[in-house]
């Protein structure tokens, strides 16, 4: 699990497929959200990768026109290149690394039921297209195209890191990550993310369960406790309410942190460097800094 939090910044999500073999070399084709290249490699380099196509996390190294691939991690059991290609097309520019972390999490899920749930969510085009392109709010935080997935990714990564820091077992860390990633997914149905008259205004947490109804139904049948724990992450958090599941507590804390960091950064975005306090244009609150 720590590996997903420690990927090199240059590592990216790739689809790799062998094109041809000549003498002692293999030609492999790699596509990502930003690259489309073919590289000649020694057979040993890709010996653990399915030649017919496989999802990878790796570093593509270009030096003086010579291509190489390093630190290859195989994402198991993903064989549909079309799904990955669509995600590459949908993810907003500059947010490509989010896909690396989101898909890479599949390698670290200890429960087959949770893995099946997560794969089903990622493969659902009707869900993932708006999720990758929506805003997280109208005029509050992360209120721009791609803001929802950016905020959700922040919550997921921070929740997983805190869970590891506090010594939670792998299953709880996994629930914290997935719960953090999906805690706001109901926002894809809110008025500021839906064109025309079909958008709604209401508690987005209640829409989480509508958006994920198909996947959650299967999870409830196969792993009731996991369903309960994940549902706690997706539910409305009332003031002074204590969550029975610690991953839920962590997710709600990280949600607030992501919002506050976004508004803190905006408060100081357009003021001189020597200002030590400023009012956020979004929430009208006063923020301070030490340097």
Model regions: which residues?
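Structural detector for short beta-strands of small beta-barrel domains
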Residues: 3-23
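Hydrophobic alpha-helical segments at protein termini of multi-pass membrane proteins
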Residues: 1-2, 56, 140
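Divalent metal-dependent catalytic cores for phosphoryl transfer on phosphate-bearing substrates
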Residues: 144, 162-273
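OB-fold/S1-family single-stranded nucleic acid-binding modules
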Residues: 61-92
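C-terminal membrane module of polytopic membrane proteins
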Residues: 258, 273-287
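Short nucleic-acid-contacting surface segments enriched for D/E, G, S/T with interspersed K/R
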Residues: 42-59
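Acidic/His-rich, divalent-metal-binding segments that scaffold phosphate/diphosphate chemistry
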Residues: 80-198
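OB-fold (S1/OB) nucleic-acid-binding surfaces
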Residues: 19-41
